[in-house]
Amino acid sequence: MDCTLVDSTCVVERAWGCWANRHDVSLEAVLWFSHGRPTIATMEHFLPGRDHAQELDEMDRYEETELEGIVAVRGAMQVVGALRKHPWAIVTSARRTLAEARVTAAGLPLPKVIVPADEIRNGKPDPEGFLRAAELLEVPPKECLVFEDTRPGIEAGMNAGMQVVAILTTVAANKLRHRPFIQDFRDVTIRPEGDHLKVDVIQVRLPDK
């Protein structure tokens, strides 16, 4: 969701900046590790063996109320608009309340299916979230198309047996191991074709060897 549909970089950096400063942890390292992972996974990675329940709750409350500056990524409004009458889902490492708050703040409509981190056991790169979304959408995984911007997310989609297109908002092309990628959703057009949707991914490129 973050940096795939919505750009919440300003809020995320402020939240993790406070946390990193409090614990004398490198903010750069925290931001690199945290993207695409549940908040609790990042806290446990840098400060293992602690009870993070209170800090997790505090960060969630902060992020759910600090929404200024959150916008839709380029092209997202057009793509989501084309999906209004068709099944699509958000699979996110955020909690449900945070996901709904950020999508709404960005001016995007909410899909009927959201699979947040607090409703599954295993986060990305485990495929559980994507498989759950396919189940709720009643669509076979092999017929699902995933757009992801992080390596854990890309791996999760692949592990679910889905087709994956990477978005170069946070991951570098030379890190994609020959996965197709786009710059942003302006490279994508969606149109109905009978009972199905035809997705044209324009300017799909493969990373150089």
Predicted regions and their residues:
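N-terminal helical cap/lid subdomain that shapes the substrate entry/recognition surface
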Residues: 1-86, 95-100, 108-109
